[in-house]
């Protein structure tokens, strides 16, 4: 962890040397406070998703979260303002026991290398089959807070988040984060179906194929493989 934090600091020093600019700790801590607040809102949605009346879910959760933690990163107040609006709407809908479909027959988790720009599948599953997608693999990262007082601890925390980003964690991070974590989320959200995406142009999780099937049987989880090659630049 110290090594990872050192690499972040080295990157900061390199940019300072090349540009002549100095790293603004005040601006950084301000962004991280906002980033932490965004994370807290997300965790609130996930608490609701553990119940029978999930609200922020499916592609609504997925596409929005990608923008929040990957692109905005606490730098834009508009995202936090929207987070708070979403939380209020979600809490109101939860209290009223509102549902996105007439019936939820199954609770699903999407895993694997998904097509972030192809949003029709979860909507089709919900409207035609009553399969509600509670959460997805790419949304379940960046859930830890960054220290906003101590510079060294802040670098350690930031490095941890970088270490646990999508391809460094789930798809290329090994058995514990790629396979074992899935079943923890299934238990957390009472999932009974896993939609396992297989990207024909990205084979990073293909070696786990048999392990996923074996573990799914052990946990009593239905596993559905969805092969795609969407949004591939070679096409």
Residue ranges and their predicted role:
Residues 1-23, 139-140, 144-235:
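Trp/Phe/Arg-rich N-terminal binding region typifying the photolyase-homology
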Residues 5, 9-146, 171:
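A charged, amphipathic alpha-helical module
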């Amino acid at each position: 962890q110290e090594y990872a934090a050192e690499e972040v600091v080295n990157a900061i020093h390199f940019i300072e040397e090349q540009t002549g600019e100095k790293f603004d700790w005040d601006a950084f801590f301000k962004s991280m406070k906002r980033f932490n607040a965004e994370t807290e809102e997300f965790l609130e949605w996930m608490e609701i998703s553990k119940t029978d009346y999930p609200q922020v879910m499916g592609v609504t959760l997925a596409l929005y979260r990608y923008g929040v933690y990957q692109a905005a990163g606490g730098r834009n107040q508009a995202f936090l303002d929207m987070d708070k609006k979403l939380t209020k709407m979600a809490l109101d809908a939860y209290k009223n026991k509102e549902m996105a479909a007439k019936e939820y027959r199954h609770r699903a988790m999407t895993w694997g290398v998904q097509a972030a720009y192809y949003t029709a599948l979860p909507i089709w599953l919900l409207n035609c089959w009553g399969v509600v997608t509670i959460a997805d693999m790419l949304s379940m990262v960046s859930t830890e807070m960054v220290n906003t007082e101590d510079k060294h601890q802040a670098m350690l925390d930031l490095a941890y988040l970088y270490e646990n980003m999508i391809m460094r964690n789930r798809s290329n991070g090994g058995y514990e984060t790629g396979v074992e974590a899935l079943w923890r989320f299934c238990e957390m959200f009472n999932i009974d179906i896993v939609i396992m995406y297989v990207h024909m142009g990205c084979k990073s999780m293909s070696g786990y194929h048999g392990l996923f099937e074996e573990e799914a049987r052990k946990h009593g989880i239905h596993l559905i493989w969805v092969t795609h090659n969407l949004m591939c630049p070679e096409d």
